[in-house]
């Protein structure tokens, strides 16, 4: 007799840049959470769905937890903390190469207040010596009792199969929430805007990134050629930022558009014509109605 089907929700939490999105993308096998080396890259809960014949795991990739500096920051931390209560299991990801960080203490204090089981995932183990890894494990073990401590490399996939095995062991019998071939519950529009924002983050200087939102104004399919026309607007807070994103003779914007278009074509499997504009909206991160316009819905969280 076959084993009953299991399912559950797993939150991936940790300081900014510890590799949460890389891990999610490695497990799902397709790029659904935006990745960049800049802090606070992930803004909304991106759900990745991993389905096998035995189980379905729904992953929630939360923003990096940090001390908020503005309303958008408040919003991002609130999402992450609320998530702890809603899920069946929490992955707390740390970066082995940087060791214990100030933000980890903040997260551990929050984790101590929830009943949800917590796995400590020590990521980037390929970057440190084995003896340093053992010291790190002991250090975190003294701070909190974790249900499992699993060293991994999200980028290379080291020990990820073992992680998924341990995760399955912690799941309850449950339904298949999503169709077998579905890997995320976010609409295509959201993922397209995230892919454009990823290129802005990767290509522009430090002052621009966190002041950027991307709004998809329209997506149209040409019935004859099957080609998609996507109109997108990059929203920034200052005209100097607009200048940086457009670049000399429009070169930076051209680069952003070209790289984003390739990623979008890979995602959708069809040819894309991408038109990108840049618009200044002063202090949008502190204005609630703008936050809602750009996809940050307070009610949803």
UniProtKB/Swiss-Prot annotation:
<keyword id="KW-0547">Nucleotide-binding</keyword>
<dbReference type="InterPro" id="IPR004044">
    <property type="entry name" value="KH_dom_type_2"/>
</dbReference>
<feature type="region of interest" description="G5">
    <location>
        <begin position="152"/>
        <end position="154"/>
    </location>
</feature>
<feature type="binding site">
    <location>
        <begin position="61"/>
        <end position="65"/>
    </location>
    <ligand>
        <name>GTP</name>
    </ligand>
</feature>
<dbReference type="InterPro" id="IPR015946">
    <property type="entry name" value="KH_dom-like_a/b"/>
</dbReference>
<keyword id="KW-0694">RNA-binding</keyword>
<dbReference type="InterPro" id="IPR005662">
    <property type="entry name" value="GTPase_Era-like"/>
</dbReference>
<dbReference type="Pfam" id="PF01926">
    <property type="entry name" value="MMR_HSR1"/>
</dbReference>
<dbReference type="Pfam" id="PF07650">
    <property type="entry name" value="KH_2"/>
</dbReference>
<feature type="region of interest" description="G3">
    <location>
        <begin position="61"/>
        <end position="64"/>
    </location>
</feature>
<dbReference type="GO" id="GO:0005525">
    <property type="term" value="F:GTP binding"/>
</dbReference>
<protein>
    <recommendedName>
        <fullName>GTPase Era</fullName>
    </recommendedName>
</protein>
<keyword id="KW-0699">rRNA-binding</keyword>
<keyword id="KW-0963">Cytoplasm</keyword>
<dbReference type="GO" id="GO:0005886">
    <property type="term" value="C:plasma membrane"/>
</dbReference>
<comment type="function">
    <text>An essential GTPase that binds both GDP and GTP, with rapid nucleotide exchange. Plays a role in 16S rRNA processing and 30S ribosomal subunit biogenesis and possibly also in cell cycle regulation and energy metabolism.</text>
</comment>
<keyword id="KW-0472">Membrane</keyword>
<feature type="binding site">
    <location>
        <begin position="14"/>
        <end position="21"/>
    </location>
    <ligand>
        <name>GTP</name>
    </ligand>
</feature>
<feature type="region of interest" description="G2">
    <location>
        <begin position="40"/>
        <end position="44"/>
    </location>
</feature>
<feature type="region of interest" description="G4">
    <location>
        <begin position="123"/>
        <end position="126"/>
    </location>
</feature>
<dbReference type="GO" id="GO:0003924">
    <property type="term" value="F:GTPase activity"/>
</dbReference>
<feature type="domain" description="Era-type G">
    <location>
        <begin position="6"/>
        <end position="173"/>
    </location>
</feature>
<dbReference type="GO" id="GO:0000028">
    <property type="term" value="P:ribosomal small subunit assembly"/>
</dbReference>
<feature type="binding site">
    <location>
        <begin position="123"/>
        <end position="126"/>
    </location>
    <ligand>
        <name>GTP</name>
    </ligand>
</feature>
<dbReference type="InterPro" id="IPR006073">
    <property type="entry name" value="GTP-bd"/>
</dbReference>
<feature type="domain" description="KH type-2">
    <location>
        <begin position="204"/>
        <end position="282"/>
    </location>
</feature>
<dbReference type="InterPro" id="IPR005225">
    <property type="entry name" value="Small_GTP-bd"/>
</dbReference>
<dbReference type="InterPro" id="IPR030388">
    <property type="entry name" value="G_ERA_dom"/>
</dbReference>
<keyword id="KW-0342">GTP-binding</keyword>
<dbReference type="GO" id="GO:0070181">
    <property type="term" value="F:small ribosomal subunit rRNA binding"/>
</dbReference>
<dbReference type="InterPro" id="IPR009019">
    <property type="entry name" value="KH_sf_prok-type"/>
</dbReference>
<dbReference type="GO" id="GO:0005829">
    <property type="term" value="C:cytosol"/>
</dbReference>
<feature type="region of interest" description="G1">
    <location>
        <begin position="14"/>
        <end position="21"/>
    </location>
</feature>
<dbReference type="GO" id="GO:0043024">
    <property type="term" value="F:ribosomal small subunit binding"/>
</dbReference>
<keyword id="KW-1003">Cell membrane</keyword>
<comment type="similarity">
    <text>Belongs to the TRAFAC class TrmE-Era-EngA-EngB-Septin-like GTPase superfamily. Era GTPase family.</text>
</comment>
<comment type="subunit">
    <text>Monomer.</text>
</comment>
<keyword id="KW-0690">Ribosome biogenesis</keyword>
<dbReference type="InterPro" id="IPR027417">
    <property type="entry name" value="P-loop_NTPase"/>
</dbReference>
């Amino acid at each position: 007799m076959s084993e009953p089907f299991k399912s559950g929700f797993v939150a991936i939490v940790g300081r900014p840049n510890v590799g949460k999105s890389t891990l999610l993308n490695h497990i799902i096998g397709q790029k659904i959470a935006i990745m960049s080396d800049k802090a606070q890259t992930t803004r909304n809960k991106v759900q990745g769905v991993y389905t096998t014949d035995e189980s379905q795991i729904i992953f929630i990739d939360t923003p990096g937890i940090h001390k908020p500096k503005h309303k958008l920051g408040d919003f991002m931390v609130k999402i992450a903390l609320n998530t702890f209560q809603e899920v069946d299991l929490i992955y707390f990801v740390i970066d082995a190469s940087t060791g214990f960080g100030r933000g980890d203490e903040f997260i551990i204090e929050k984790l101590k207040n929830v009943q949800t089981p917590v796995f400590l995932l020590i990521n980037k183990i390929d970057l440190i010596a084995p003896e340093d890894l053992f010291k790190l494990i002991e250090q975190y073990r003294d701070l909190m009792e974790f249900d499992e401590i699993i060293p991994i490399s999200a980028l290379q996939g080291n020990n990820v199969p073992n992680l998924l095995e341990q995760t399955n062991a912690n799941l309850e019998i449950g339904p298949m929430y999503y169709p077998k071939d579905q890997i995320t519950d976010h609409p295509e529009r959201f993922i397209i805007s995230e892919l454009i924002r990823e290129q802005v983050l990767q290509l522009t200087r430090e002052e621009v990134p966190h002041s950027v939102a991307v709004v998809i104004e329209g997506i149209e399919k040409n019935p004859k050629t099957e080609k998609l026309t996507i109109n997108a607007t990059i929203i920034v807070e200052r005209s100097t930022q607009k200048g940086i994103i457009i670049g000399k003779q429009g070169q930076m914007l051209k680069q952003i558009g070209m790289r984003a278009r390739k990623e979008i074509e890979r995602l959708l499997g069809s040819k894309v014509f991408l038109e990108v504009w840049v618009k200044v909206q002063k202090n949008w991160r502190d204005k609630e109605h703008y936050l809602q316009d750009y996809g940050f819905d307070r009610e949803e969280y």
